[in-house]
Amino acid sequence: MKVAVLGAAGGIGQALALLLKNQLPAGSELSLYDIAPVTPGVAADLSHIPTQVRVKGFAGEDPSPALKDADVVLISAGVARKPGMDRSDLFNVNAGIVRNLIEKVAQNCPKALIGIITNPVNTTVAIAAEVLKKAGVYDKKRLFGVTTLDIIRANTFVAELKGKDPQTTNVPVIGGHSGVTILPLLSQVAGVSFTDEEVAALTKRIQNAGTEVVEAKAGGGSATLSMGQAAARFGLSLIRALNGEKDVIECTYTEGDGEHARFFAQPVRLGKNGVEEYLPIGQLSDFEKQSLNGMLDVLKKDIILGEEFINK
């Protein structure tokens, strides 16, 4: 099994690569690419960790050598948020980066499962889809926006509030991956109940958690360690599904039946070809229904921005 990480010298990329070196199945190959010349050194550094995962590092303009025959590609390349920016401010730089990388994915590993981490995910996934479509290799079941950070944050915050174990707390999060488009389904969390005030406060905190980290880092970056953890969890779920494990379920931002928007984060069952089954979002509370209806215009605009970036 070959996993490629694009943007591997960045804060998220290095955290992700460290976790994958430690957690990928024995015999896997971890292929690291970044435009930064330090990347082969990151690979050398990781290669000293005693696990049966081979690591190779590639730098420079062309990611092709890193991508050749990859089974899974995780893309974290791009600029990070600074205080005062929201994820959509990143669009101007990151849109072009994602386009260029996905063009190379289409050429070198068109059947790979692709996880997009680069923000703004609501838009960059649409960009990736349109690039793959133009190349004649788009399969909607193989392209994912990694929204797992919203899930792990929701699990953590709910567990903290209710005195539960965060590792056994499971909060589904649907919609998108920025601001109001992030919708935690708190009404579906087993074994806990919330007041209306708690729901409003928790929802807001989960939606704004990225900003909380950006501000706490005081200009020194955005969420890299928790995002690395989230991306590793999602990447390892893809690998488990590729290896034939049954009932691997994750929430992810993907092109489904289009009921709410062309791309929408929802629970899916993963399999050898990517999405095996789109799972229902279940019963929503009145607050959740209202929040869902209220965010769809924002989400759809984000998607159109990505489509038009490629098709204009």
Curated annotation (Swiss-Prot):
EC number(s) from the headed UniProt entry: 1.1.1.37
Residues engaged in binding substrate: R81, R87, N119, R153
Catalytic residue list: H177 (proton acceptor)
Name of the top EC class for this enzyme: oxidoreductase
Signal peptide: none
A Gene Ontology term for the protein's cellular component: cytoplasm
Entry keyword set: NAD, Oxidoreductase, Tricarboxylic acid cycle
One GO MF term: L-malate dehydrogenase (NAD+) activity
Reactions it catalyzes: (S)-malate + NAD(+) = oxaloacetate + NADH + H(+)
Binding site for NAD(+): G7, A8, A9, G10, G11, I12, G13, D34, N94, I117, T118, N119, M227
Subunit structure: Homodimer.
Protein name: Malate dehydrogenase
Gene behind the chain: mdh
